[in-house]
Amino acid sequence: MNGCNLDCIYCSVDEGFSSKRPVDFIIERDYLVNEFRKLLEFKNTTNIHANIAGQGETLMYPEIVELVREIRQIHSVDIISIITNGTMLTELLIDKLVSAGLTRLNISLNAIDKGLADKIANKPYNIEKVKEMIRYASKRLQVILVPVLIPGINDAEIDKIIEFSKSICMEGGNVKLGIQNFLSYRFGRNPVNEISWGEFYERLAGLEKVHNINLKYSEERLFESKELPKPFKKGWSIVVKIICDGRLKNEKLAVSCGRVISIPNCHKEKGDIKVKIVRDKHNIFVGVLK
């Protein structure tokens, strides 16, 4: 689903209270699970990491506990993680998620200072409650703090977040860090200019020396698997059926061969149309009117 209880100044998908998106979506739980099962049956592998994320705050999904529970029933799934801003976490919800089979929480903690946390979230951000929930969760599952380094805004806060994570580890909590580099997105909010990956990793190296910690987080379990075949490829002309409006202005979503195709600048409301596929990377398709 999309939708968010915050309004972060750096949001890559322009979610929250000031969002300019004209359409919201929520995907049925059964559909999500069934399609995920089909994909895993095709890949025919094990040790799968299922990461639950959406264009917004994941914990706003009304059936999040049930979704985790059903994914846990899939034998090939090992890790189940959720990305969250942490503000909706409670001890009860954490316990329910762990009981359902959640193994990891990725929490986008971007500042320790209350005033700066509010500024980045563009909404009141209860930093003390979020810190309390991080401590509680870290005793029950793995927590990865994934702050976004926003140059010129929260540079000094990264030091505080590192020390906060180290303090939890000293208390016996299971916490890791996965610091992210702010990237500009065409349809997102871009309060600053992004820095190069070279400069980003130089900054991480400097922080590693200061805090005596490894900050180059990597997912050791990554492995190759069969790629889902593409029913059509970039450059092809195909006939698609318009289903509904998309999230961008004048965007339509259409279907063909069991796939969704995004069509920008489309003013036709329904019916079949011919489009040229201009993007097929990662099985994400964009078509333009012929």
Model-derived regions: residue spans:
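Terminal RNA-binding accessory module
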Residues: 220-290
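Canonical Radical SAM [4Fe-4S] cluster-binding loop centered on the CxxxCxxC motif
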Residues: 1-31
